[in-house]
Curated annotation (Swiss-Prot):
It is found in: Cytoplasm. Coiled coil: none annotated. The lineage of its organism: Bacteria, Pseudomonadati, Pseudomonadota, Gammaproteobacteria, Alteromonadales. It catalyses: 5-[(5-phospho-1-deoxy-D-ribulos-1-ylimino)methylamino]-1-(5-phospho-beta-D-ribosyl)imidazole-4-carboxamide + L-glutamine = D-erythro-1-(imidazol-4-yl)glycerol 3-phosphate + 5-amino-1-(5-phospho-beta-D-ribosyl)imidazole-4-carboxamide + L-glutamate + H(+). IGPS catalyzes the conversion of PRFAR and glutamine to IGP, AICAR and glutamate. The HisF subunit catalyzes the cyclization activity that produces IGP and AICAR from PRFAR using the ammonia provided by the HisH subunit. One of its GO terms (cellular component) is cytoplasm. Its EC number is 4.3.2.10. HAMAP family: HisF. Heterodimer of HisH and HisF. GO terms for molecular function: imidazoleglycerol-phosphate synthase activity; lyase activity. This is Imidazole glycerol phosphate synthase subunit HisF. It comes from Shewanella sp. (strain W3-18-1). The active site is at D11, D130. Disulfide bonds: none annotated.
Amino acid sequence: MLAKRLVPCLDVKDGKVVKGVQFRNHEIVGDIVPLAARYAEEGADELVFYDITASAHERVVDKSWVSRVAEQIDIPFCVAGGIKTISQARELLAFGADKISINSPALTDPSLISRLQDEFGRQCIVIGIDSFFDASSNSYKVKQFTGDEAATKDTQWFTQDWVEEVQKRGCGEIVLNVMNQDGVRGGYDIKQLSLVRAICDVPLIASGGAGTMAHFRDVFIEAKVDAALAASVFHKAIINIGELKAYLAAEGIAIRR
């Protein structure tokens, strides 16, 4: 069994790490590089950085902090935010990022996935999917431009259909951001993640809902995800990564130590 990964997520806005609840009302958490260094020291397996307003504001993630992060940490990290071209992706990889994640730009132009995969290989192409449960239709749907409340919009895609589409186009990994659970620390959406797991042949990362160590255990065992992403429980020091790894190992889960 491959070891499960623990992935702190750092949402970036105006050069600071922020955190909201259900993708709204973001508050400043701290500075990018010190937080990245702290999580690397605690034992994170990798980091994910989302420049949350880049796509909505028609710009690309700021490369200056990408290079500073690369100088300070020795674990892999992924960056996202407004990446729409091969050249933009190449620059970010050259500045030290190990993976590129695209979300809204892929919804606008799905062929971008294939072009990035052809250029760099699927191992470094991650697709972020912002999924919400629509009670009126009793279905999971994909939203776009979620980093800016004013710009957020519905798309034509049902979540499971989009998961299948991005795999056909060559993504190497999927992060499922469950919007209904985000920031509320009530547990991962096991039901939705299990449905996606059944049709997902690439590594699947759960995002949204972590509040206790048991939530990580449950998502690994019940939804069979490859990695668990979390933000507020790490930012607020509710859970220490090293202690979480010890807990998961004691629960019989293969974890990187």
